Amino acid sequence: TPDHREVPSFSSRWEPNFGLTFSK
């Protein structure tokens, strides 16, 4: 289940980045 493991890790790492980018 490589997809399941990469999904949360990728989302968690991009979620904060996206929020900061959207705010800026």
UniProtKB/Swiss-Prot annotation:
Chief site of localization: secreted
Keyword entries, A-Z: Antibiotic, Antimicrobial, Secreted
UniProt keyword annotation of Ligase present: no
UniProt-annotated location(s): Secreted
A GO cellular component annotation in the UniProt record: extracellular region
Biological processes per GO annotation: defense response to bacterium
Source organism, top-level taxon: Eukaryota
Role according to the record: Hemolymph antibacterial protein.
Family of the protein in this entry: Belongs to the attacin/sarcotoxin-2 family.
Name used for this protein in its record: Attacin
